Amino acid sequence: MSEIWEDAIKSNAWPFVEAKKILDSLNGKIPEKGYVLFETGYGPSGLPHIGTFGENARMVMVQKAFEQLSDIPTKLICFSDDMDGLRKVPSNIPNPEMVAQYMDMPLTSIPDTFGECESYGHYMNAKLRSFLDKFGFEYEFYSSTNCYKAGMFDEMLIMVLEKYDEIMELMLPTFREERKATYSPCMPICPKTGKVLQVPIEKWDAKAGTVTYKDEAGNYIEVPVTGGHCKLQWKPDFGMRWAALKVDYEMYGKDHLANARLYSEICRILGGKPPVQLCYELFLDENGEKISKSKGNSISVDDWLKCAPVESMALFMYQNPTRAKRLFFDVIPKNVDKYITFNQKYHLEEDRAKRFANPVYHIHHGNVPQIETFGITYSLLLNLTSVCNPSDKSVLWGFISKYEPKATPNTSPYLDHLAEFAIRYYNDFIKAHKSYLSPSEKHKVILQDILDMLSDIADQTEAEAIQKAIYDIGMKAGYENLRDYFKDLYQILLGQNEGPRLGTFIKLYGVQEMKKLVEGQL
């Protein structure tokens, strides 16, 4: 354990950094409850998106890193805020006008617009659990509705009434004058309508365990805060949950950062110890806007997994969690190829600290599979797909087998999967956007030079030699920036702005096939 500890800390990999923070907060001792509790949260107002997966994937990376550093048992819970009142109707669900009739109702009290589960909230929870299960996450699922109604939070809710003034003193300075007049940490569930009410509380009684408010007719209504008859506002709810469940580690998006101090103070007021926390940056869409469950303006988990292996998605989640990243379809090929590179480096590396620093160690929780692609990248397969437009992967294997006779679907099942993924990605995201550049007279001279070069080279010419020859043709053509030269070639030959190292691509595609491609543009 001491050797692992030393190398883990030396690696400076962020899951180990976080794990050490947790261990330090415990002074290396087992908590009274007997385990360290990791918590992730889910707001089921809309369909789970890739950010939801990301939070859970990162959390498990920290949990597994902690287990490497300590023998203290751990538990992960995924908490769904499914008792929240509906504030906004998502745009990416069926029958939104039906859902709009249930504004302010708890999500588990709204009919399922998909027609599959007992409520809208239950459907969203099922969607979350199904894809968490698919990735083998080991977790316990907690429903806010169930926790409130089963009395799990009753003791804390009574304490909220006992500490009511102290909580209000903390919360009120964070609001505008208008909101201060109506705010209460407690939101009664209306006995008549079932709605979550944001109303001023006229009276609270810690001994009786009740709050009193005025209804629309001016009548005083007294309700218990226990047994699911009241819910806390989301900020006090966050801190209360930490205290009630004795959470040791939580991560949340940057949109929570401004309120993190409030969560921690509420937790302390209620007698708890705030957990170690990590604030991660949010994902942005291609326009730089925050991705949203209700907008559905993001790549879905299904989109990614249709076109690439799950470990490429996990790699995207691992990298720089505290830095904002754009999440759009172009990131998929880049992360597949990054994963291949990291995987190969991991198995060549003998230094354990450097292995611990490699993302694939954390993606696979220490059990890193060995893959073989014979130097063929996902991007190269995409470009091959782009020029031959195959109906199935056997067409790609025809080129792969000529390039590397040792490569077969059996000797490289990973490469076989990538070939299938490449065809799907091409059909979904490249094919419709291809736009060819008509060659100018200058371009035709360049293409003829490339054709002459290809006619002169021997079959065994290495990719680097071909690449240099193409580079020299660009230099001779007088381009100030060779990036423009290669961009022109990609647009003329592939119908896209970016492309592969042409030397490697020609070796894979074949010299004779490349000559036909060039001739077709002359």
From Swiss-Prot:
Its main location: cytoplasm. It comes from Rickettsia massiliae (strain Mtu5). It holds the Pfam family tRNA-synt_1f. Its EC number is 6.1.1.6. Gene3D superfamilies: 1.10.10.350, HUPs. One of its GO terms (biological process) is lysyl-tRNA aminoacylation. It is found in: Cytoplasm. The lineage of its organism: Bacteria, Pseudomonadati, Pseudomonadota, Alphaproteobacteria, Rickettsiales. Keywords: Aminoacyl-tRNA synthetase, ATP-binding, Cytoplasm, Ligase, Nucleotide-binding, Protein biosynthesis. This is Lysine--tRNA ligase. GO terms for cellular component: cytoplasm. Belongs to the class-I aminoacyl-tRNA synthetase family. GO terms for molecular function: ATP binding; lysine-tRNA ligase activity; tRNA binding. HAMAP family: Lys_tRNA_synth_class1. InterPro entries: aa-tRNA-synth_I_codon-bd_sub2 (IPR020751), aa-tRNA-synth_I_CS (IPR001412), aa_tRNA-synth_I_cd-bd_sf (IPR008925), Lys-tRNA-ligase (IPR002904), Rossmann-like_a/b/a_fold (IPR014729).
